[in-house]
Curated annotation (Swiss-Prot):
It catalyses: K(+)(in) + H(+)(in) = K(+)(out) + H(+)(out). Belongs to the HAK/KUP transporter (TC 2.A.72) family. The keyword Lipoprotein does not apply. Pfam families: K_trans (PF02705), K_trans_C (PF22776). InterPro entries: K+_transporter, K_trans_C, K_trans_N, Kup. Keywords: Cell inner membrane, Cell membrane, Ion transport, Membrane, Potassium, Potassium transport, Symport, Transmembrane, Transmembrane helix, Transport. The keyword Cell membrane applies. This is Probable potassium transport system protein Kup 1.
């Protein structure tokens, strides 16, 4: 075979492999990302016509509500998330913290107070996603299992126990990773989308009058007709958007293109047909508004559809679990959350992670919610407030990013972000009226997480400020060692430092107590960047004199620091022989934190919470991959 033909064959083979890889990513993204959005037809539309705030299912109201559902999907998912926000990625990573990292990482001249304000706003939005991550698995699986009551009322007593068992099994398979889970769940959700599209299309064929809902004027007329009651029903409309924030947060797991292809190719058309089909059914049979989804299913297919919907809602839960894992990992790397154990579950896609402690915490909280509420209708009223809060904060942060980093003109920011925020605000106000109906639950969960993140962020700021005040200039230390030499012991001592300037406090304590220093002393700083993965030089090293060297290792917030690997690179850069494990010691500071005398009650509480979190976070030895038998921890008492 000639070189030209061989090159063409290799190129065609590469293209085929690339297409197969993309198809697998699209299928995995379909299974993990779109489960929550995809199963909303189970309960979303019926909430608009039932409960304390439901409207009568008259033909005009049915057309108006369905129009609101369709245009909410188009404006808030297709436009806001898929077209706009997915372009606001941070080197491939999405989510509210990716927005926050871009805003705070590029600030210049805004002042510390403004930066802290954006951080707290971003943390509040991120915290709401935890409440959503607890409630979504509960309401999704519970709503599917309640379909058993439609098929066989005698099974009603088994709905809650079966839901608990299914949720427990879902969390138990998380260690296998989102990629493997997505590969298994993708075909299930593909079948689900095809099924709901077929059911909707059958009803649409019988009653095409519902196609009027495609005209957005019917949604506007719905508000004019129903007034305040119509506005309140937006609390039900927002249920069709649950999972949109996870779509953005999961960008790092699968990439933007597979997520877009899955949305436009299957998810969006199927959702539109499903809501149109339910609307067509209600035009002919308004008395079925209590359960329009299952009413579309012929009697012979009811049990198979209940089984498929149960599988699909298991998939739906995965979207939020994956997003919460990603969010927690980003938070810890950016300094907004204590260190936790992170396991990477894929060698080819580094964004696929598993957090054991968080997984079991979510499982217990989700099961507790199921046992407490016991009905999906009660839970459906609960989590719209968390969803709309996160969506609104995301829009605000996007506006700041567009203005400060992308340098959009004010009129463009007002046109794009202002229009989206107006819709977000309407959803939020409508859901705020459901606070006493269960909306308090996600807010309570979000507030608990926000307290942890806020206290950690505030405590770290106090600690860094105190450390700067106690730090000795490095030049002074080098001068002191030159005039007053200390005993030198064989080997290498590595002293970890949070700052790349000054002298690490752990080194000062070592000199104070031991009156000796290793022949080679390395001051190591692990620098966490505000991008997902570090580009360019990973490790920089330079000699300082007196047998001391400064080493800085740079990592993105989606990477795991590996100190031994960084030190191997540093030794090569410094011209040192490979470091011998038995002659290298790592020195870490272990600080006891207390509030300074005279501190107010709020500061004492903040320092107390921060000290508790610091005491119980994952140890630096395990987190940085240090050999446990070569680590020395030196304690100190610090008043903040």
């Amino acid at each position: 075979m000639s070189a030209g033909y061989r090159s063409m064959a290799i190129s065609a083979s590469d293209r085929e492999r690339g297409q197969q890889s993309m198809a697998m990513l699209v299928l995995a993204a379909l299974g993990v990302v779109y489960g929550d959005l995809g199963t909303s037809p189970l309960y979303a539309l019926q909430e608009a016509f039932n409960g304390d705030h439901g409207v009568r299912p008259t033909p005009d109201n049915v057309v108006g509500v369905v129009s609101l559902f369709l245009w909410s999907l188009i404006l808030m998912v297709s436009v806001k998330y898929v077209m706009v926000l997915m372009r606001a990625d941070n080197k491939g990573e999405g989510g509210i913290l990716a927005l926050l990292a871009q805003i705070t990482g590029g600030r210049s001249g805004d002042g510390r107070r403004v930066a802290v304000g954006w951080v707290l706003l971003g943390l509040a939005g991120a915290a709401m996603l935890y409440g959503d991550g607890v409630i979504t698995p509960a309401v999704s699986v519970l709503s599917a299992m309640e379909g058993l009551q439609v098929a066989t009322p005698a099974l009603a007593a088994y709905v809650v126990p079966a839901t608990v068992v299914i949720l427990a099994m879902l969390f138990m398979i998380q260690p296998f990773g989102s990629g493997r889970v997505g590969a298994a769940f993708g075909p299930i959700l593909a079948a689900w989308f095809v099924a709901i599209a077929a059911l909707g299309l059958a009803q649409l064929w019988r009653n095409p009058a519902i196609l009027q809902a495609v005209n957005p004027w019917h949604g506007i007329a719905y508000f004019q007709r129903n007034g305040f009651a119509g506005f309140v029903s937006l609390g039900a409309v927002v249920l069709c958007l649950t999972g949109a924030e996870a779509l953005y947060a999961d960008m790092g797991h699968f990439g933007a293109r597979p997520i877009r292809l899955a949305w436009y190719g299957l998810a969006l058309p199927a959702l539109i047909l499903s809501y149109l089909g339910q609307g067509a059914l209600l035009l002919a049979h308004p008395q079925l508004s209590g359960r329009p989804f299952y009413s579309m299913v012929p009697e012979w297919g009811l049990l198979p559809m209940v089984a498929l919907s149960t599988l699909a809602t298991i998939v739906a839960s995965q979207a939020l679990i994956t997003a919460v894992f990603s969010l927690t990992h980003q938070s810890a790397q950016l300094g907004f959350f204590p260190r936790v154990k992170v396991l990477h579950t894929s060698g080819s896609h580094k964004g696929q992670i598993y957090l054991p402690l968080l997984n079991w915490t979510l499982m217990l909280a989700t099961i507790a919610v199921v046992l407490g509420f016991r009905e999906s209708g009660k839970l459906a009223a609960a989590f719209g407030l968390a969803v709309s809060t996160t969506m609104a904060i995301t829009t605000v942060l996007f506006a700041v990013l567009a203005r400060r980093r992308w340098h959009w003109p004010w009129w463009a920011v007002a046109l794009v972000a202002g229009s989206l925020f107006a819709i977000d605000l309407a959803f939020w106000l409508a859901n705020a009226l459901k606070f006493l109906d269960g909306g308090w639950l996600p807010l309570l969960l979000g507030l608990a997480v926000f307290c942890v993140m806020g206290c950690w962020f505030g405590g770290r700021r106090l600690q860094m400020r105190e450390s700067r005040g106690r730090q000795l200039p490095l030049e002074a230390l080098l001068s002191s060692l030159g005039m007053n030499p200390v005993a030198r012991i064989p080997g290498v001592g590595v002293f970890l430092s949070e700052r790349a300037d000054g002298t690490p406090l752990v080194l000062l304590h070592h000199l104070k107590h031991n009156q000796a220093l290793h022949e080679t002393a390395i001051l190591l700083t692990l620098q966490m960047l505000d991008v997902p993965r570090a580009a360019g030089e990973r490790v920089s090293a330079q000699w300082l004199g007196q047998g001391m060297a400064r080493v800085t290792a740079r990592y993105g917030y989606m990477e795991e620091p590996d100190v031994p690997e960084a030190m191997a690179r540093a030794a090569e850069a410094l011209g040192l022989p490979p470091l011998e494990p038995l002659s290298t010691s790592y020195y870490l500071g272990r600080q006891t934190l207390v509030a300074a005398p005279g501190s107010g009650g709020l500061k004492r509480w903040l320092v107390g919470v921060f000290a508790f979190l610091r005491q119980n976070e994952r140890s630096a030895t395990l987190y940085f991959g240090l050999p446990p038998n070569r680590v020395v921890e030196l304690g100190a008492r610090i008043e903040l």
